[in-house]
Amino acid sequence: MKKQDNNMTRRDFIKTSSAGLAGAAILASPLGPLAGRALAATAPNLAIEKGATLNVLRWSVFVSGDKDLWEANCRKWEKATGCTVVNEYLSWEDVRPKAAMSAAVGAGPDLVLGWHDDPWLYPDKLVDVTDVAEYLGAKYGGWEDACIKYGVKDGRWIAIPMGAPGQQIVYRKSWADEAGYSEFPKTTDEFIKCCKKLKSMGHPVGFALGHSVGDGNNFAYTWLWSFGASTVDKGGNPAIDSPETRNALDGMKELYSAMIPGCASWLDPHNNKSFLAEQISVTNNGISIYYAAKKDPKLQNLAADIYHAELPIGPIGKPTQLHLFDQAFIFKHTAVPNAAKHFLMFMLEKEQAEPWMDAMIGYVTPGLKDYRNLSVWTSDPKNTAYRDCVKNMLWNGYPGPIGPGSAAVMAEYVVVDMFANYCARGMSADRAIERAEKSIARAYRR
C-alpha cells in the first residue's frame, strides 16, 4: 500500500485502502491447481461502520516489541478511520476456551487472534474473509501452503493467517563448540549425541514435555513426524500404532536422558527462564529468549553466545516442522464486520507489518511469501533461522484432515503426553501408544 501522506483526509485514506490499490502478484489460490495464477491486487471495497468500536481478543506477548508496535498500529488505524480498537490480551492457553465460549453464545469479542485450527471448530459462526485474503495474497506474493490449509474451508477463507510465533533450536554456541559441534547438528541422530555430550559436560538440555501450548506441542509433533510417524492417516484414521512411532519414542527417551529434571511438567515459560538462568544449554523456542537477553544490560555476554538452528531433520529426510500458528477470525455476531476486515487488511499491509516484524526481531514469521524478503531476517544473522518457519510448516493434523479431531488431539496434549508417559512416567511404549490411540480415535469420532 502506498505510504499515507500525513495530510491525507480520513475519507481519502479509507477510499484508497479499500478500493484504489492495484498491482500484480502471484496468489497461491485457496484450492490446489489454481495456485500459480496471477490475480490483480485490488483491495476490497469495505464500507467501514461509522464510529465503530472493535473488540479484539489476542494472546499475550512474549516480546515487548510485539505489543508496542501492535498498539501503535492500532492507533494509526484509529486515527485514519475514526474507529476505536480495544485489545484484550490473554495467556496463550486461555484464548481458545474464551473464543469457543464466544462462538457458542454469540457474544463477546468481534475479532480473535487464535491458534491453529480454532476456526474449524465453528466455521459457520465466522465472517467470510476471502476478499481480504485474496487481496493480500495477490499483493504480497501469495500465501504459504500451510496458510491455505489452515485458512480455507470449502473454498472460502474463514480466517486471515497472521503468522507463526515460530520455534527453532536455541543453543549456547560456546558450549556446543566445547562439545565438538562448531556447526550445530542437522539430524536427529547427531542432535541426540550432541545433547548427551553437553549433559556429560554439566550443561543439560531442556524441552517441555508438560502441557505447554507452544513449545511442548510443537516439539512433540515435529519429532513424531520426523521419524515418519503421525497421529492419523490421510483419511483421519488413527495411525499412531506404528514402528515409526516406537522409533520416535526411543529417540525422545534418549534425548530425555540429557534433559534437566522437571521437563515433564514444564509449561511455556519454563524453558525461557531456565535458559536465561544458564541452567540449560539447548531448547526449542521462539526468538524471545534472544530478544530478552539482548534487551537486558546484565545479559549481554549471554546474548552474544545465543545462537539459533533449524529443528533437526529425522529419518524421513525433510523438514517436518510444527509451529504455533496464529489466525485472525471475525465472528458473525459482530456489529462491525467491515471495520474488522479493514483492520486486518491494514495490519498486514507492509507499512504496518514491516515495523511490527522489526520491533519483535521476527518473533512472528508471516505467512505472506514476499515477507520472507524483509530485512529483519538478515539484519542480524541470528534471526535468519526463523524466516522459513511457515514455509516449512505442516498442519497439526498432518497428513489427515483439519477439523475438530485434529484440534482436540492437540488441545488435549495427546502426543506430548505419549512422549512424557514413556520417557518420564515409566509407561511402556505399548501402553503409551495404546492410550494415545484411544484418545485420537475418540477425538476423530466427535
Question: What name fits each language-model region?
Answer:
Residues 72-143, 152, 174-186, 274, ...:
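Extracytoplasmic "Venus flytrap"/periplasmic binding protein-like
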Residues 43-45, 63-82, 415:
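Short, polar/charged alpha-helical segment
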Residues 154-162, 167, 192-238, 280:
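Extracytoplasmic/periplasmic solute-binding protein
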Residues 41-48, 115-168, 192, 219, ...:
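Hinge/lid segment of periplasmic solute-binding proteins
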Residues 47-48, 84-85, 177, 393-446:
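Conserved C-terminal helix/tail region of periplasmic/extracytoplasmic solute-binding proteins
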Residues 143, 306-310, 358-414, 421:
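Long, aromatic- and glycine/proline-rich binding clefts that accommodate carbohydrate-like moieties
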Residues 1-12, 25, 34-35:
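N-terminal secretory signal peptides
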Residues 194-201, 235-264, 307, 311:
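Glycine-centered hinge/linker elements that transmit conformational signals in sensory
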